[in-house]
Amino acid sequence: MTQTVYILNGPNLNLLGTREPEIYGRETLADIEARCRTLCEGHGFELMFLQSNHEGQLVDWIQEARTSACGIIINPAAYTHTSVAIRDALSACEMPIFEVHLSNVHAREAFRHHSYVSAIATGVIAGFGSFGYVAALEKLAQDVGA
C-alpha cells in the first residue's frame, strides 16, 4: 500500500519567486513541488502538496492527514508565530511532523523567533531554502522505512 505524505504551505508561499527573493529565493512553489514529487516517487510515496493563505483550511488538511498520511511536512509561514489552532491540530497527529522554513527565522525579526509548532515537531529545518523540504522528505522516508 502506498504511503501518503502531506506537504502543507502557509500564507504568502504562493508568491515564492517574486516576493522578497533576497530572503526566500527565486524558486517558485511549483518548482519546490516538482522537486518534492520526484523525490516522493523515488521513495514510493504519494504526495499531497497544498498551499493556503487561510488558517482554517490548513487545520482541515492537517485533520485529513491524521487518518490518511504517514507524515506531515509543514511550512506554516507567518502562522508559525501566531497559530495555536495549527499547533493543536498537529499535536493530535500520531506521525512524524517536520517544520520547514526557507529562511533562518532566528536570524530575522524578534517576532519570528517563537514557533508554536516547534515544540510538537519531530524536527525543524530553517535557513536551507528549498533544500529544507528535501531534507525533511529524506528523514521522513528513513523514519517510516520507505
Curated annotation (Swiss-Prot):
InterPro entries: DHquinase_II, DHquinase_II_CS, DHquinase_II_sf. Substrate binds at N75, H81, D88, L102, S103, R112. It catalyses: 3-dehydroquinate = 3-dehydroshikimate + H2O. Pathway: Metabolic intermediate biosynthesis; chorismate biosynthesis; chorismate from D-erythrose 4-phosphate and phosphoenolpyruvate: step 3/7. It comes from the Bacteria. GO terms for molecular function: 3-dehydroquinate dehydratase activity. GO terms for biological process: amino acid biosynthetic process; aromatic amino acid family biosynthetic process; chorismate biosynthetic process; quinate catabolic process. The record marks R19 as: Transition state stabilizer. SUPFAM superfamilies: Type II 3-dehydroquinate dehydratase (SSF52304). The keyword Transcription does not apply. Catalyzes a trans-dehydration via an enolate intermediate. Belongs to the type-II 3-dehydroquinase family. PANTHER family: CATABOLIC 3-DEHYDROQUINASE. Homododecamer. This is 3-dehydroquinate dehydratase.
